[in-house]
Amino acid sequence: MTTTLLMASLIVSFLLILYYTTIVVASSESRCRRYKSIISFGDSIADTGNYVHLSNVNNLPQAAFLPYGESFFHPPSGRYSDGRLVIDFIAEFLGLPYVPPYFGSQNVSFNQGINFAVYGATALDRAFLVKQGIKSDFTNISLSVQLNTFKQILPNLCASSTRDCREMLGDSLILMGEIGGNDYNYPFFEGKSINEIKELVPLIIKAISSAIVDLIDLGGKTFLVPGNFPIGCSTAYLTLFQTATVEHDPFTGCIPWLNKFGEHHNEQLKIELKQLQKLYPHVNIIYADYYNSLYGLFQEPAKYGFKNRPLAACCGVGGQYNFTIGKECGENGVSYCQNPSEYVNWDGYHLTEATYQKMAQGLLNGRYTTPAFDWSCLGSYDFSG
């Protein structure tokens, strides 16, 4: 009897050890991956050329011309910056090529990355926004359109790869944006009230969440999901709401109530991502804190190599912030600074390469990601960009 109990106890102990070992190994494998590709969705913050390719050749957007791209790409690549974006610095760190835009690309391999992000894109469909009285004239390539396009071409992507579809997605870092910012930008710039705009928050969060679930069902395992920016520090927003009565933070010069709105979106997004993580424990859903990774640059610009005037645009003209709505970067009579690396803001709406590099470093080293990336399987790694 004693022998039987002893054997049973040993068997139970062995099974428990095996169980917990399996859990640890599975967790380790889901955390640290040698990503073989990047799949990207979003708007101009991640657009590597889609909007330019989608545009009429006789009416190309400003990002198709200098000074866009003047710090790195020569000629312009269609990125809304003077150079590289966060997605580019992540690709460099992973040893992958810059992620090519899907739309308009010819004779391009997507085996190591594909990008559907489009300037002006929204999380919510254009038709829905129009019904709410919100104009969205830049593009109809919303998040759902990007995702459906990806689903349609997925069989072809897998056919050109040695991996099956689920394996391909599992080996990819999936970048979900930034997306949702334009859903707020349009109504803010159209004069909608803060209460009207707040009603969109749960709908936008749901759209992002639903897209993640769809990609999980297809085999996605690692998602980097950015939050919103501190829009109260945006050159364009500071110009839009520039009145004698508007309250500014005495330390940064930003508009507090706009930043609180961005924080509200981010808190709701984090709550949703936590719920998704509980539902899909085998998946790694990483929140990218774009808000604080950028806000620190406004708090201590000199510490990060920027001028002590971080709210002004490098490329622009007029006003307190070197920016005038309707007379913007790339247009006749609009100049740009000779040292973009000393500026946080590029064109009033978008950021400089130097800013995106600092943000990417903060994401990759884990300071601004929850949970932090685990790079232990890579051996040595460098976050300097």
Swiss-Prot record:
It is found in: Secreted. The keyword Hydrolase applies. GO terms for molecular function: hydrolase activity, acting on ester bonds. It holds the Pfam family Lipase_GDSL. It comes from the Eukaryota. Residues 1-26 form the signal peptide. InterPro entries: GDSL, SGNH_hydro_sf, SGNH_plant_lipase-like. The active site is at 44 (nucleophile), 347, 350. Belongs to the 'GDSL' lipolytic enzyme family. This is GDSL esterase/lipase At1g28650.
